[in-house]
Amino acid sequence: MKSLFDRTRVYTMTGEGSVSAEGADGIVVSLADNGSLALKDGCSYDDFDALCRANAQTDAEILLYIPALDEEQRKLLAHCAIRNAMWNRILFVSAAHKTLDALKAEYPEARISPVCDDNMVRPWIYAAYMGAPAYLMEAKEILLDADAWGSPTVDRAHNANVCIFAIGADDEDTVKALVRVGCDAVLTHDAVMARGLVW
């Protein structure tokens, strides 16, 4: 099975502000519950603005993991992304699905991605219904039903035209298995290792 992209993408979870040095496709950052952006030691919304500016001239994407946010916080993030011409390269990721739903209602062009776990039945249908181009799931859950020919989980996501991103792809065997079954992206702490396996 092939990825919906031209190849499996690599997103670095190192917490650095720019991904160009590692050659990854994107960076994963988390907005903390208190409104600080967790890069290395926790930063402010201003640092999200700086992160957008630092990556505006690259092809890098930002996977921004957000907690439950109120309307004002969602507006602040959206305007920051739009102001820096990064809107189409930010994927708002969250386990707070109501926040994603509200963000999508307020900004229909927002790219959202729910975090799903093994308790969710048919997450690909759920993601498609939300208007999400992708959903995130633990690598071990994606590989649970995998065999030599692929993974029904990945196949079903692709049949729904939804990408599946794997969290926790930090060793060679896991990355190789995810690429083999057609996973669309891996989120890793070792982008150099993963990049060498997918390119």
Go through the PLM ranges and name each one:
Residues 1-199:
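Phosphate-group recognition and catalysis centered on beta-loop-alpha active-site segments
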